Structures are given as C-alpha cells and as structure tokens.
Amino acid sequence: MKVIIGLGNIGKEYEKTRHNAGFIAIDLLLEKYNYSSVKQEFNSLIYTTIINNQKVLLVKPLTFMNNSGLAVRQIINFYKINLNDLIIIHDDKDLNISRIQFKKDGSSAGHNGIKSIINNLQTQNFYRLRIGVNQVPKEWKIVDWVLSKFSDEELNLLKQSFIDKIEFINDFTNNKTFIYLMNKYN
C-alpha cells in the first residue's frame, strides 16, 4: 500500500491559499484517479484508490497545518506503513510557483506542518513533494504570505505544473526508487 498525504488547512477561508498547495494536489490526483471510497478517520479524509494494482490512500489531514503530524502518525501506525511508501505533499515558499521538487530527508525549513510530522514520527526520513508557492516578498510576513490566496494566474500555473508531473504516481506505485523519481521529475 502507498500513502500520499497533502498538507493544508481546513475551511473555506483557506481554499486557494498558498499553504493549501498539498490539498490542491490531492484534489488534482482525485480528478485523475477514481477513488472507490472516502472515509473520515484518524483526523483525516482518506480516499482509497487502486493504481497499477496497488492500493493507494490519498489523504487530507483535518488537523490544521501545524498539527498535521498527529494525523500522519495515526495513519502510519494503523496501516503499518513503511516510510518508503509515504509521500508528503506540501507548499514551499523557497521555490518558484512553477517548480515542483521531490526531496528526501532534511529539516522542516521552517514549515510548521513538516515540523509537526518530524516531531510525531521522530524522524526526518520520509519523502516529500515540495510545491513552489513563490518566495515571500520583503514587505510581507511569512504567515501572511502562506495564508494569502493565489491569483487565478498563479493557481492555474501551479495546477498545470503539478499535472505535468502527475505521472510520478505511476512510477511511485510501480515501486521505482525515490532517487529515480528525483532524477526523472526534479
């Protein structure tokens, strides 16, 4: 089984915000791959689909960004997921909006959702798909920037950039190595 978790904040007021890039990515995956069921458990919405004869959980934590690790830990523990079978999708303020990058390991780089996951899993050793949301303008505070809404042009660019790389899920479910994914899609 593979698990792909997109980070974001719940609620209408957070839709289309930079911090919800992970939720936007999960929505794009749900549009492409039919899901057989959805349930709310482990502080998350969990969508189940089959890709390449592999069960895949597409997940949106309902804990708000700063507590994402709680939901991730509950899912990992319940389903006994190997961390090599997990990808966390999140926004990255250090990447341009059209940039999507795979990463393994490393610090949170100030991202509170990733920090929560590291604290709850007690490791930095998990795969990430970073979605660029543009650098914080000098006159903005970081929190205000990541909670600001994308312009229509930015949102379309973000979605198209993700769609251009959406086939990563086929390689991931075919058990390609993460180094292969980084070399092919970064």
Curated annotation (Swiss-Prot):
Annotated site, Stabilizes the basic form of H active site to accept a proton, chain positions: 91
Gene Ontology terms describing biological process: protein quality control for misfolded or incompletely synthesized proteins; rescue of stalled ribosome
Where in the cell?
A: Cytoplasm
Instruction: Keyword check for Thylakoid, yes or no.
Output: no
Catalytic activity line of the entry: an N-acyl-L-alpha-aminoacyl-tRNA + H2O = an N-acyl-L-amino acid + a tRNA + H(+)
E.C. numbers: 3.1.1.29
Name the cystine pairs. Answer: none
Q: Native species of this protein?
A: Mycoplasma mycoides subsp. mycoides SC (strain CCUG 32753 / NCTC 10114 / PG1)
| Protein name per Swiss-Prot or TrEMBL | Peptidyl-tRNA hydrolase
Q: What does this protein do?
A: Hydrolyzes ribosome-free peptidyl-tRNAs (with 1 or more amino acids incorporated), which drop off the ribosome during protein synthesis, or as a result of ribosome stalling.
How does the record describe its quaternary structure?
Monomer.
**Record site feature (Discriminates between blocked and unblocked aminoacyl-tRNA), residues:** 9
Pfam assignment, any one: Pept_tRNA_hydro
Q: Which family does it belong to?
A: Belongs to the PTH family.
Keywords assigned by UniProt, alphabetized: Cytoplasm, Hydrolase, RNA-binding, tRNA-binding
Instruction: Spell out the molecular function terms from Gene Ontology.
Output: peptidyl-tRNA hydrolase activity; tRNA binding
Catalytic residues identified in the record: 19 (proton acceptor)
Which Gene3D superfamilies does this entry report, sorted A to Z? Peptidyl-tRNA hydrolase
NCBIfam families from the xrefs?
A: pth
Principal localization? cytoplasm
Lineage, top-rank taxon, reads Bacteria
